[in-house]
């Protein structure tokens, strides 16, 4: 998994460099999470396989991190090199924020924050009781940013989901504590997150969002339990993770990856 996350980060840098698009810091912070989700958690047959209709569902609610999603899909064989090289370009099919029509593996069009969890709750309700070819209940997994936890729609869905006994719904919050204009905890503090989610009836755990073994153990323990509660993992992460001069720096929410920056960043990843 660690090698996969490293390769995904390299792809993210390449995509950002070619397209000269922002949000590199946000994409790097969730590379480990996405590597785990696609490598170990999701049941995701290819779109031309019979059981694709019984796939698990993943929603990227923090859609400005689309580069990380595209890089992950490419690494695990769900997207072609041609597709990701056409990201954010004339004639390309992959936009800067996710578009459901761009790929069968993109489950939701997004951009405006706070919608991933409400949509995930509806999807989880609609597939309750449905099993895949492995005989397992289909899952819905959603990745959110910590800044979007400030959205009221998130808390409406958070209150509603436990009442529906959606144990096959899993939320991962990329808590890098940096959003568009500063520290999320200072602009509109959302703490104590654990107590809030737990009070609404979720199984809630705080984990290192760069420790894939820890995250996997938490998810597998939940899946094997008899709980009726949905799961939320508060994943403590570092914006720009893996590239020292980008780490924990607000400006890399916006800065572009020039050729010089790209080569220097690759050296750090090596």
PLM-predicted stretches and their roles:
Residues 212, 217-270:
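Glycine/aspartate-rich loop-and-adjacent alpha/beta segment that forms the canonical ThDP
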Residues 71, 99, 153-155, 181-185, ...:
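Short acidic, glycine/serine/threonine-rich loops at helix termini
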Residues 151-176, 232-234:
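A short alpha/beta connector and helix-capping loop motif
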Residues 15, 22, 27-163:
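Cofactor-binding active-site loop characterized by glycine-rich and histidine/acidic residues
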Residues 136-138, 186-218:
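Conserved thiamine diphosphate
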Residues 56-58, 138-142, 169, 227-237:
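Generic beta-sheet signal
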Residues 32, 64-65, 176-177, 211, ...:
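Glycine-rich beta-alpha junction loops
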Residues 5-21, 174-176:
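N-terminal capping segment at the start of a domain
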